[in-house]
Amino acid sequence: LSRVLFLAGLLALPAFAAEPTLYGRYEHIKIEQIGKTLPAKMDTGAMTASLSARDIEQFQRDGEDWVRFRLAVEGADDTLYEQRLLGISRIKTRAEEAGNVDPDSEPPRAERPVVGMQLCIGDQLREVEVNLTDRTHFSYPLLIGAETIRDLNAAIYPTEKYTAGQPTC
């Protein structure tokens, strides 16, 4: 009997390992390259991650595409950051989401540069693709979308906030 219980316990281990980490709707996330911790909205309705930036400019370095930008967040200094450009993200506009576009025409899409950032939430450090755009008209300078939430093997408690505490990476 003890052998059967032991084997049954081993079979159950993968189910326990697959349990998602539970985060609140808002979390503190540290951006390693920048050395800042920002409040972030964990948004399952958005696909990608987005960071509030200004003075966004694409340029060439040694034959590669790069982007330079400044943070557009409260308390940010005037530091100019440079990252290798990973691609361009085409994001639905609010007009398209609301159905306020001509169905016979190509809907307008916002094009945003995408960079790789190391993000720390709780004790998890992940390389994440983040698009850059001015989010100063939003309450949270960093948005974490469904792709990153899935990569973190996470689930979101919509009624909870800051369940992971301050980042420890």
Feature map (PLM): residue ranges:
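Sec-dependent signal peptide recognition
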Residues: 1-7
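Pepsin/retropepsin-fold aspartyl endopeptidases
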Residues: 17-169
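Hydrophobic h-region of N-terminal signal peptides that target proteins for export
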Residues: 8-17
